[in-house]
Amino acid sequence: MLLRIRSPAGTARLTVQPETTGEDFAEAILNTIPAADPQPDPATLALSNQPGAAGESVPFHALSGRTVGDMGFSHGDLLFLSYKPRAADPDSHPAMQATAPHPQPAQPDPSHPKTHTDPPMPNTIPLRDLSSVQEPEIDQYWEKQTGKIERKRDPAFCRHGDKAMCDYCMPLEPYDPKFQSEHQIKHLSYHAYLRKLLSSRPPTASSATDLPPLSPTSLSVITPCPTGAHPSFPDGICSTCQPSAVTLQSQPFRMVDHIEFASPSIIEGLLSAWRRTGTQRIAFLIGREDKYEKVPMGIKVIVEAVWEPKQEGELDGLTVETPWSDESRVQEIAKWCDKGLSVVGMIYTDLTPSPDDITKTLYKRHAQSYTASSLEMLLSAAYQLSHPLSTRMSPTGHYSSRFVTCCLTGDKDGGVDILAWQASEHAEAMVKAGIVEASVDPAVVRVRKPGEGEYVPEVFYSYKNEYGLQVKMPAKPTFPVEYLYVNITHGFPLAPSPLFLSNAFPTENRPGLHDQSMQVVITQLAAILKTSDAEIGDAGTWPGRIKKDVEKWLSDWHLVTFLCMQGLFSLKEQQILCRAATAHAHPNDTYALEELFASGGWQTLLTIVDSEASANARSNPPPTSSFNNLGIDSPAFAGPSTESSAPPSGPDSVGAGAGAGPVGGRERVCPHCTFVNEHGGSDCEICGLPLDG
């Protein structure tokens, strides 16, 4: 006869004979429980003809000494097995490690193919491990806040005193749709969106704190299939392992609400490179996250500096190294400079001079063309995937990203404007699964045709037609790029207080424009120290004015990173250098500059500066030699010609009418920046341009 057994592990079918003993029957029932599921406590096993406590429950030990025919079962009966899980052995190892990106699914017992087991969710980690996820400080801050939107007493509708409250003045939820519409907030903030998801759960339910509300989108085929009922893809596929169809809509929230540039000089640095070369530039944004008060529970990114990677600029594009080789080192130096400082995004130029007026830029990104091209969107999504956001609100321990993208492009007035955006969470999933590609038309994205051994799910996009009805359209072969990103506002502070005060040191990776070198460091530091009669090698004799000038000179992101990467300072001294560069922003760190002056690396640098200054002093010609080399009298010694004022003889001398060559063969004035070069090279020490013009 056929009997059905329903247990917490699922439903199974057993074929037994009337003469089957109770012991064999009990063993067959236990075999329906997969080995990967929690095993039952033998003392709690019971069999019933009704679920729960409604029917007659028979303990397992009562089956001993009997046969199936004696138990009164009929063909097709449904029996209910109940038990309590056995307590876990504390010495046993966990079944799945939290760090495993693709946990192996539990395989059902092949001897019972009809046993049904719920497959585990792909790319998940046990909930108990989410407590170890380290969230950013801004997320920890907003989790502790109520997020309510406070309202004042309405004099027109409120009929109560100052200490009372009614429907017209009570605080609103951060996701209130009416407030969002009145203040023209297109996207909810990340934490307001979380509050909206959690608001649908009962406040007393434990799931409100145990089950993460966010579910990362996965568009890849799960291999191997969690059911184990067929070979892995591409040899087999089922509804469990294949991804669901995708319906694209405008993302209702954004991870970052605003981008604030700490100083206009950050943007000016990129623009100056484009103005001098005419080629495009890209840089990574160095900044930190902070609260943004203009939207409920908002988050903004404050950009303090940029780092330009190795690249080759072109008139209409650029080539940049991938992956970015110096990222880990730059991240480390940024962390030393200020708490929370890290790589937060990227910025690049897309500027073209107007053919009618080269002093203006071409306006090519607008509502009738595109804001961000499909290729740019795929690039943004790829960088966001490499910079995920750590959060306990997702079963995987991370969700989307706060990596932002900015573009400097022409505006309608011929000036330069900043466009900022983020790729949506769906865009990240589609790029990760490799189902989209860039198009020749920058305003649309192509859905890839699946190749051999590939699976591309159905993709749709939804919009409102001219009648106000929601319409769903297939996205193959193309769909608008607007479905893959959210716009971000940007601006500058009214009272700038940048973390880095100087930008005099050359920017990295600009060969031919201006190069970084120790000679530039020595020249700039010597120019500050020579304004005082104090001894260069003894920082203790420097007046307060000189120390302040040195501190401001050190507060340069490009200078700090250059010195840290030169090997002149030890690891501990590099940390002191970063502290000294940002000491003005940390009033409690008053001894950072003195610690730097006392370090061995700084003393070595001063020794080099001192020896360079001494060598220059010995090589400088007398005051009148410049006039003698030009064949004219010195204004200080104008009068009858004397033997001492005669032009020096030798190959370096230049007579009157012979032309003005390099002064004494050493000093040469740069025709570009007018700096007097005292070396015999062919390029200027400051601007790096040829001295021959």
Curated annotation (Swiss-Prot):
Keywords: Cytoplasm, Endoplasmic reticulum, Membrane, mRNA transport, Nucleus, Protein transport, Translocation, Transport. Residues 644-655 have a biased composition (Low complexity). It is found in: Cytoplasm, Perinuclear region; Endoplasmic reticulum membrane; Nucleus membrane. GO terms for biological process: mRNA transport; protein transport; ubiquitin-dependent protein catabolic process. Residues 85-132, 615-662 are annotated as: Disordered. InterPro entries: MPN, Npl4, NPL4_C, NPL4_Zn-bd_put. GO terms for cellular component: endoplasmic reticulum membrane; nuclear membrane; perinuclear region of cytoplasm. The keyword Membrane applies. Residues 615-631 have a biased composition (Polar residues). The keyword Ribosomal protein does not apply. CDD domains: MPN_NPL4. Residues 259-399 form the MPN domain. It is a peripheral membrane protein. One of its GO terms (molecular function) is ubiquitin protein ligase binding. Its main location: cytoplasm. Involved in the import of nuclear-targeted proteins into the nucleus and the export of poly(A) RNA out of the nucleus. Has a role in the endoplasmic reticulum-associated degradation (ERAD) pathway. Belongs to the NPL4 family. This is Nuclear protein localization protein 4. It comes from Cryptococcus neoformans var. neoformans serotype D (strain B-3501A) (Filobasidiella neoformans). The gene is NPL4.
